């Protein structure tokens, strides 16, 4: 019995250490957004600099995650994407599931899933080596970041304050992303710039 317990304890320590490392390297509100160059599901190269002078939303996603499905099955994520696309916000969805993981989806599979959900991001990015996730210390799906036109992070955290996978919670939720964008685009300081994200772990 000792060996399995020891192995489990070691694995737990590794997971805790990894989580601590991500937290220590987290991109805080007010910090410059890490630059990235990554390929989207159509094979096009996408850089943060492509959206210079615009607000950018980064949405970490994974179709296998029930927390992600909560926001897509309810239409909540698509509504946000479309609402802010109409206000010239660049919304980028990122799947950072490592190519070696069982939940990995190919670019074609991700594209097909997004279409099946009637999603409307400006692009869906395939981070199959999890490099972009590490740069941003993305921890969960969903994990949301809002970047201002000057290239600084003004929000990092959960999509809302209802930390569940229950579709019924969406209607009564306080949506942090909508609030941050609304305040910033009105010339006001962002009241809540950092929250703790919730959801499934990013599959590094």
Role assignments for model-derived ranges:
Residues 9-22:
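Bacterial N-terminal signal peptides
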Residues 20-35:
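N-proximal helix/coil linker or "cap" segments that precede and/or mark the start of modular domains
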Residues 36-56:
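A short beta-strand-turn-helix
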Residues 50-69, 181:
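Short active-site neighborhood of thiol/selenol oxidoreductases, capturing the structured segment around
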Residues 53-56, 86-91, 119-122, 149-150:
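Loop/turn elements at helix/coil->beta-strand transitions in domains of secreted/extracellular proteins
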Residues 69-117, 128-135:
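Structural microenvironment flanking redox-active thiols in thiol-disulfide oxidoreductases
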Residues 111-148, 153-154:
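Short, internal strand/loop/helix patches
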Residues 146-204:
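Thiol-/selenol-based redox modules, centered on thioredoxin-like
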